[in-house]
Amino acid sequence: MRTGETKNYYIWDKAKATDPAWTKPFPKFGKTLTTIDPMSQVMCMTGLFGPVGKGWRFKNTYTYTDQNVFAEVIIQWKDNDTWYGYGPISSVCALYKKNGSLDDEAPKKATTDALTKGFSYLGLNADVFLGMFDNNKYISEMKTKFSTNGSAESNVKIIDPAKLRKDKDDK
């Protein structure tokens, strides 16, 4: 069964397409993977459900060991005045940098990673997670799609990052 063939994909289909402007390649495990800007995911959730705290929210807890911090995230969203959710989704991050100093951003990094994984279960950036960003033709299609109407197949209004950078540089 493909997306769009049943009403069960109503969130997935709105959130599956990724604007390439919010991605970047990074090397890992001997190949190049695609990473997604986490704030673009927050923007997408806001476009889908409304402001954080009102239309969607997350709850997180941390567990610390001598070397690591574990973040557990529960994601919730409102649909027709009913809250839905799932989780916890977990992630772990080292508390110390390679030079031995404390990484004071470790909890934030673990939370961000858990949110990204959790958002993927709703369908956010599904094209990246399904490996479609390994295909240059697909990326070109997404660039065209997002440059044409700003929101691809979705009802989510995506802000053009190039325009944001230009506006910021003009100030």
Could you tell me what each predicted segment is?
Residues 1-6, 139-171:
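Interfaces that engage single-stranded nucleic acids at replication/repair/recombination sites
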Residues 29, 36-145:
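Positively charged, aromatic-enriched nucleic acid-contacting surfaces
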Residues 6-15, 23, 45, 136, ...:
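Intrinsically disordered, low-complexity regions
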Residues 1-38:
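N-terminal, Lys/Arg- and Ser/Thr-rich interaction peptides
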